[in-house]
Regions:
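Short N-terminal targeting/anchoring amphipathic segment
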Residues: 61-62, 76-104, 118-121
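Membrane-proximal helix-turn-helix segments that form the acceptor-binding/catalytic region
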Residues: 107-115, 143-164
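Helix-loop-beta element that forms the nucleotide-linked donor phosphate-binding surface
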Residues: 157-161, 173-192, 200
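Alpha-helix capping/helix-boundary segments
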Residues: 46, 128, 171-173
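N-terminal subdomain of nucleotide-sugar transferases
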Residues: 1-46, 56-58, 82, 115-118, ...
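Conserved nucleotide-sugar phosphate-binding/catalytic loop shared by glycosyltransferases and other
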Residues: 48-74, 78-81
Length: 210
């Protein structure tokens, strides 16, 4: 079965966080024999730039803007238009914006996509619980920090409502498993797909070296 997959991610030559990870992920997805096309639903560039030359199986559709409250809706529209079999969301807390509302609305889109019929897997590179708000622009703002954490709990629950959720740090896995014991969360460390698995050569069959 040939699969048409979507990858929602910041993507080069853009400068947003996780763009290089998105590139490597798209290439690994396209390398699979059971994948016919990878449609990258990427962030729009602030100024025209030359797009990368990619594998013929990879097509980039720049359909959402950073800090836009309609970024999630734009992605959902693109998923429907493209008719993909499934979507992978390569995201972190500030993927869709560095302001609270656009960031939160964007992070709730994977669960919405699933409800609309597109199986959606989330690769979460960080979670709000792992961020020390005292080391951000919210330092000393106790009330606002409390509001952000409450909203963050709602957003995290929404992210866990995707078809599957993976995290890249053991501490995130431990936290989510403790707070949401009924949710299935997987650990996929950074760099897992960088090199293909290789058979280990038995010591006795290896060439002798000085």
């Amino acid at each position: 079965m040939d699969l048409k997959l979507a990858l929602v991610s910041a993507f080069p030559p853009g400068q947003q966080s996780l763009n290089e990870y998105g590139l490597h992920l798209a290439c690994e997805m396209a390398a699979r024999e059971d994948v016919s096309e990878v449609v990258v639903l990427a962030d729009r560039l602030p100024a025209p730039r030359t797009e990368l030359v990619l594998d013929p199986k990879i097509r980039v559709v720049r359909c959402w803007e950073f800090n836009s409250v309609v970024a999630g809706a734009s992605i959902l529209t693109a998923l429907t238009r493209e008719g993909v079999d499934a979507a992978v969301w390569n995201i972190q807390t500030a993927t869709f914006g560095d302001r609270e509302l656009p960031a939160a609305l964007g992070l709730m889109a994977p669960a919405t996509a699933r409800l609309l019929g597109t199986p959606s897997g989330v690769i979460a590179h960080n979670i709000l619980a792992g961020i020390d708000l005292e080391n951000t622009q919210l330092k000393g703002q106790r009330l606002r920090q409390a509001v952000i954490r409450a909203a963050g709990a709602i957003v995290t629950r929404a992210m866990l409502a995707a078809t599957y959720t993976t995290v890249t740090l053991r501490s995130y896995l431990d936290h989510l498993s403790a707070v949401f014991p009924n949710k299935e969360v997987h650990l996929v460390p950074h760099g897992t797909f960088d090199t293909a698995a290789q058979d280990i050569i038995p010591v006795e069959n290896r060439p002798r070296r000085l």
